[in-house]
Amino acid sequence: MDHVTQYPVIVDTHRHPMGPRMQAKMAERGLYDPKQGFPQTNAQDLICYRECFDLDYAMPKQREGGVTLSLITNGGEVDWIARDLLQVSTGEALKFLNDEYREISDRYPGEFALTANAHALEEGCRPIVEEMIKGGAKAIAVASSYGDGADRAFLDSPKAEWLWEFAEANDIVVHIHPPMQSIGHESLMQYRLNEAVGRPFDSTVNGARMIASGVFDRHPKLQVLIVHMGGGLASIVGRLEFNWRLNYNGIKNPPADKPYTNKRSPFDYFKTNILVDSMGFSAIGVRAAIELCGVDRVVFGSDFGPVPYGIKEQVQSVEEVLPSVADREWVFWKTSNRIFRLGLSDTGFISAPALPVAA
């Protein structure tokens, strides 16, 4: 179905634009050759598309897709950017990223909103996060996990408590994106499975651990946004439910740190604490996300740039699932406007001649 319906506002909560300084660093590290055309790749299987590297080329496509405002996030890559790309401290990397994104925002006024990128397990970055929030950042962006192998740590780590305390106290949403190298990546480097399967799996494991460890019971007002439709959480939340109910009941001296500590059904937290985005090229996935979280807890996300197409297709996925224009507006902008305090006005709905939308 050709996309013919226009909306006055669509907020894309999942964008990773790249500015000239980041491009220069990638070229310096041999990850990108500015003399070659696009697409191109490298030994790390990082595929570079023009839509990610050339904003003057990408922005008309963003507008044609109907997006009017995008959140800039890169919390999933902070660790990699600091350690491998820039080879500097986390604090220096955050300042680099934040300066880069301010330049992008200034270059395209009114089309980007900033987030405060952070390392969830390093409380030392808190002053930078506080400064960004005071400067207008709309959320805190972090990775779903850090490290690798047996040393990989998720956001149920005690080291993340500073983040939850700060976010809850300041009513700031935490945007959670998987890292470049996901859990199990060593078995997923064929067929781009690290990207297709590994990263959503990383989000799934992290979301399950946050629920089971009682993060949302300790911080009942905390709001987190898990990208890629929440990974596979909609498919496995029932399994979390029965394992939570069984737990280690009847087991004498249960092993330390293994029993569930959450006080409510795992399903409940999707109605009160967890939001997800619509990125995934699947109406089935959008429908599952809405059934799990509610229509007012799913926000639009495209991942456009690193994924060099698909804004229109992902708008259509929402349209296919939600025949009601009023319901679509929750996904396209109203929920984002509320949770990120974007200050957008309700300008109504503009309709061009449209084909019927499947129920």
Predicted regions and their residues:
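Extended, non-globular alpha-helical segments
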Residues: 124-137
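Mid-to-C-terminal alpha-helical segments outside catalytic/metal-binding sites
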Residues: 1-13, 19-69, 99-106, 130, ...
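Catalytic pocket-lining loop regions of alpha/beta-barrel enzymes
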Residues: 137-299, 350-359
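Short glycine-enriched loops at secondary-structure junctions
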Residues: 75-76, 120, 178-183, 304-306
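Short aromatic-enriched loop/helix-cap "lid" or pocket-rim segments at secondary-structure transitions
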Residues: 21-26, 83-85, 128, 186-189, ...
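Short, well-structured secondary-structure segments
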Residues: 45, 49, 58-62, 66-93, ...
